[in-house]
A protein has these predicted regions:
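Short amphipathic alpha-helix that is part of the acyltransferase structural core
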Residues: 1-45, 169
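Short low-complexity, flexible loop/linker segments enriched in glycine and/or proline
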Residues: 41, 135-138, 181-183
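A short helix-loop-beta-strand connector motif used in the catalytic cores of GNAT acetyltransferases and
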Residues: 43-59
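Extracellular structured ligand-interaction cores
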Residues: 55, 86, 119, 169-171
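Conserved beta-hairpin
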Residues: 55-70, 159-161, 165-168
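Acyl-donor binding region in acyl/amide transferases
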Residues: 79-164
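Acyltransferase donor/substrate-recognition loop-hinge adjacent to the catalytic core
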Residues: 148-186
Length: 186
């Protein structure tokens, strides 16, 4: 059985922030976020987005082991700007398990309904300058620091839950010449 626990303590927040490092520990393509930045994101005193956002985050637990995490953000500013009524999901990570995925997204969807939102959209951050998006191809390439890495199975779980892709974002790698003669010319 999966239990969903709302993050209310600093210890739980540390678990929430550290979870991707555990889930992807054997994945060389994963680039971890900066621990202090992620901790600050959820600190109302340090993140100015809390002036116009409401946010909550949860841990998924099974038999005392963490098996997933998800955050939810209600950005009043973004909804006003884009004329939407959306709840954002963010920082979602989970094992390949239908019950875990269901429990995490059901929790966000429930809060979205309580707040009167029409839809859940993501993964997005507090602002449009935060990490966003979900990897749908290129799992064999090192992820970028500004985007999320996720396992390929996420797509199947989100599709099964009724989520659809909103937009394609393309990330490119530019090789910078290291030949001294070329560099001197510039």
């Amino acid at each position: 059985m999966v239990s969903i626990i709302e993050v209310t303590t600093k210890r739980q927040l540390r678990q929430f922030v550290e979870y991707p490092n555990i889930l992807y520990k054997d994945v060389p393509q994963f680039v971890p976020a900066t621990f202090d930045d992620d901790m600050s994101d959820w600190n109302k005193k340090k993140n100015p987005a809390f002036e116009y956002c409401e946010a909550r985050c949860w841990l998924a637990m099974r038999s005392g082991e963490m098996v997933g995490r998800i955050g939810a953000i209600l950005s009043h500013k973004a909804n006003e700007k884009w004329h939407t009524n959306r709840m954002r999901f963010t920082q979602v990570d989970f094992i390949d398990d239908e019950q875990v995925a269901n429990a995490l997204f059901t929790t966000v969807e429930r809060w979205a309904r309580e707040k009167g939102c029409d839809e859940v959209h993501g993964p997005l951050g507090f602002t449009d300058l935060d990490r966003e998006g979900m990897l749908v191809e290129g799992f064999d390439r090192r992820s970028c620091f500004f985007t999320y890495y996720n396992h390929p199975y996420y797509i199947n779980h989100l599709t099964r839950l009724g989520y659809v892709k909103d937009v394609d974002w393309v990330e490119n790698l530019i090789q910078v010449p290291t030949d001294e003669k070329i560099i001197e010319r510039w």
